[in-house]
Amino acid sequence: MHLSITDNVTAEEKEELLTGLRAYNAQFLDLATFGGDIGVYMRDDNGVMLGGLIGVRKGDWLNIDYLWVRDSVRGTGVGSQLIKTAEEEARRKGCRHALVDTVSFQARPFYEKQGYQVQMSLQDYPYQGMQRHYLTKHL
């Protein structure tokens, strides 16, 4: 056996590792219910993105990976429309729950307003004095 370390993980190394991990996980999970991106985007009349949400289905869960709203339209309901639409699509695809994480300077109050509840807060992440919050919602 040989142990190596690198700062430059190659696509091939990543794929080799993930192939092994997926094979192991397949013993316990229905991988057909994993994957499948959900993308919801709001654009202006010129096609410029005003906001968007990208999530992925993982079993019975919608994992919200990214949510962004342009500063000029924050507070106008765009974020709420994005998340509501993603939740509806996730329900249609069989999801029963949603999970999102956010850092203290981001959008915890927004998610709580949408019905999400904090399950855990990781202190001093990514830096001293900040927190990473994990929130869930029953769909």
Listing of model-derived features with the role each one plays in the protein:
Residues 17, 111-112, 116:
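Conserved active-site tyrosine of GNAT-family acetyltransferases
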Residues 75-88, 113:
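Conserved acetyl-CoA-binding loop-helix of GNAT-fold acetyltransferases
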Residues 37-41, 52, 66, 132:
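Short hydrophobic/aromatic beta-strand element in the GNAT-like acyltransferase core
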Residues 90-103:
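Conserved GNAT acetyl-CoA-binding A-motif
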Residues 67-74:
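A short, internal acetyl-CoA/4′-phosphopantetheine-binding micro-motif in the GNAT/acyltransferase core
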Residues 1-9, 137:
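Conserved N-terminal entry element of GNAT/NAT acetyltransferase domains
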Residues 31-32, 44-46, 53-62, 67:
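A conserved beta-strand-loop-helix scaffold within acyl/acetyltransferase catalytic domains
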Residues 99-101, 117-134:
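Conserved catalytic-core motifs of GNAT/GCN5-like acyltransferases
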